[in-house]
Amino acid sequence: MGEIMRKESEKPVISVIMPAYQAAQYIGQAIESVQSQTCGQAWELLVIDDCSTDGTMEAVRRYASDPRIHYIRQRKNRGVAAARNLGIKKAQGAYLAFLDADDWWDADKLRLQMEWIKRTGAVLCCTGRELMQPDGTPQGRVIGVPQSITYRMLLRTNVIPCGSVLLRADAAREFGFVCDRYHEDYILWLRILKKYGAAVGVNVPALKCRQSAGGKSRNKWKSAVMQYGSYRYLGYGRLRALYYMMFYTLHGVWKYFGASGGRQK
C-alpha cells in the first residue's frame, strides 16, 4: 500500500474520506470543495486511491502543498467499501464525512451539519442533494431529506446519501462498511440508527451528485437486487424483505416522477 503526502498538521476534528478510482477528470473539483468549507473546524482529507491507472495520483499531487490532504494508494483494486474502511482506520478526526471523487459539496455543508449535531446530539447527520449531469451542470432535480430519520423509516428505503453524511467516528468504526455486493452504506446507516437513534437531516442540497450512466444507483435492477440482499444480510426473512421491497419500489417511482424538477432524464 503506497502512501504519500502524509504531513503533520493540527489534529483534525473532521476527517473527510474520499475513495477514488479512475477519478483524474473530476477529483480536483471534489478536493477544492473540501478546501472551501466554512465550518471553522480543523479537518483532514484522506484520498484512498483504489489502484487507478488514469492519472488520479498526478491529479491529487497538485494539492500536495496543503498539509491537510493525505493520499493513500491501494496496491490492488478492492472496491469502494474497502477503500472507505481503510479511510476510517486511518482517520484522526472525531467526526467522519464521505465524498466520492466525482461529487462535490457546497461551502457551508460541514458548518451546517456541525451546528445541527451540536444542537441535537445526533450521531449521524445528512443533507439533501442536487443531481448533476456528467459535465457538472444541474439536471434541475433536488432530492430533500426529512429532518428526523428513524430506523423504521430508513428500512423502507435509503434516504441518506453517503456523500452527504457527517457522523461520529466511533460509531463508524464500531460497524464499518460491508462488501460491495450489498448497499454497504445503507447497511451501516441502519446499524447506527438501530443502536444510537434517529439521524438528523438538513434539508439543503449541499451535496452535488454527478450522475453517470454506469453508476450503481442508476442500474435499477442491480440496485433492487442489492437492496433485497441488504435486508437479508441484516437478518430479515424473505417475506419481511419483500414487504420492505414494496416500499423501496414505491419510493423509487416517487423519485423518478415526483422529485423537484420532474421526471429523471
Q: What role is predicted for each listed range?
A:
Residues 108-139:
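Conserved donor NDP-sugar-binding/catalytic core segment of glycosyltransferases
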Residues 1-33:
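N-proximal low-complexity "stem/linker" segments adjacent to membrane-targeting elements
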Residues 33, 49-58, 76, 100:
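A conserved acidic beta->alpha catalytic loop
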Residues 96:
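Short aromatic/hydrophobic "clamp" motif used to bind/position activated sugar donors
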Residues 32-42:
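Short, acidic, metal-binding catalytic loop of nucleotide-sugar glycosyltransferases
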Residues 144-223, 230:
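Conserved nucleotide-sugar donor-binding catalytic segment
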Residues 74-91, 112:
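Glycine-rich, basic loop-to-helix element that forms the pyrophosphate-binding segment
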Residues 25-28, 54-62, 104, 108:
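Acidic helix N-cap motif at the loop->helix transition within catalytic regions
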